[in-house]
Swiss-Prot record:
MF terms in GO: ion channel inhibitor activity; toxin activity
Disulfide bonds: C63-C77, C70-C82, C76-C89
Compartments in which it is found: Secreted
Organism: Cyriopagopus hainanus
UniProt tissue specificity: Expressed by the venom gland.
Major place of residence: secreted
Pfam family, one: Toxin_12
Domain text: The presence of a 'disulfide through disulfide knot' structurally defines this protein as a knottin.
Protein name: U6-theraphotoxin-Hhn1a 3
Keyword list, A-Z: Disulfide bond, Ion channel impairing toxin, Knottin, Secreted, Signal, Toxin
């Protein structure tokens, strides 16, 4: 009698543990998807914030300044490079005169 009760409890515990792992898996997947959407939205907002080039026309100055919109690095001023993802001129980590 005691062994049957222990066996039932053991099966019940196994089911509870399995359900707990399944719930944790669902929460982890949901959290990852939510974080991915937040990152995409944050990148889109950040890109839109700096995409407008409020400075002078690039033809007038010959190059685009820091955070100016660009398509290739040659459009940016010295010590700036066109950022691959956001398409603006960012510092290329060089220092010089």
């Amino acid at each position: 009698m005691l062994i049957k009760q222990f066996s039932r409890r053991s099966k019940n515990t196994k089911v509870q543990i399995l359900l707990a792992f399944a719930a944790l898996f669902v929460l982890a997947v949901g959290s990852y998807a939510s974080e991915s959407k937040k990152l995409d939205l944050r990148d889109a907002l950040f890109s839109a914030m700096f995409s407008a080039d409020y400075q002078l026309n690039p033809q007038e100055r010959g190059c685009r300044y820091f955070l100016g919109e660009c398509k290739k690095t040659s459009e940016c001023c010295e010590h700036l490079a066109c950022h691959d993802k956001h398409k603006w001129c960012a510092w290329d980590w060089t220092i010089g005169k």
